[in-house]
From Swiss-Prot:
Main location: other
A GO BP entry: cell adhesion
Location(s), subcellular: Fimbrium; Membrane
Protein name, as recorded: Fimbrial protein
Assembly and interaction partners: The pili are polar flexible filaments of about 5.4 nanometers diameter and 2.5 micrometers average length; they consist of only a single polypeptide chain arranged in a helical configuration of five subunits per turn in the assembled pilus.
Keyword line: Fimbrium, Membrane, Methylation, Transmembrane, Transmembrane helix
Transmembrane residue ranges: 8-28
Gene, per the UniProt record: fimA
A Pfam family it matches: Pilin
Amino acid sequence: MKSLQKGFTLIELMIVVAIIGILAAFAIPAYNDYIARSQAAEGVSLADGLKVRIAENLQDGECKGPDADPASGVVGNQDKGKYALAEIKGDYDASKTDAGDPNGCQVEITYGQGTAEGKISKLITGKKLVLEQLVNGSFIAGAGTDLADKFIPNAVKVKK
């Protein structure tokens, strides 16, 4: 009489382990890129928050306002998030009037200088994303950006 086989053979288990290894070889780098892209998006959110400050400063004809002074209620030119630090830079150019032209104001985002410095992806740590503000108030990625193109959020990528 023939006995029934119960369980898995060693070969079957080794094949399953090999398949899981192959899947992990593709999934882990893709997951790391996903994490870096999501952390890079925080910088653009910080820049959006600085739009109001830039608009207020433009009433005085400049991009940067006075430095932060909590005693007088001045909020300053920086905003710090979990993964990035965003800072207003640049010089206002009043001669630009077309909605798609840069107005001279920039927001420089430095990754790895946020409140969770040790928890940021190594793929974007120390990288900068420089956003040029257009006359219409929107941002595009500008010169001085050393963040890899695949991590720059689509909302600020220059359309090619």
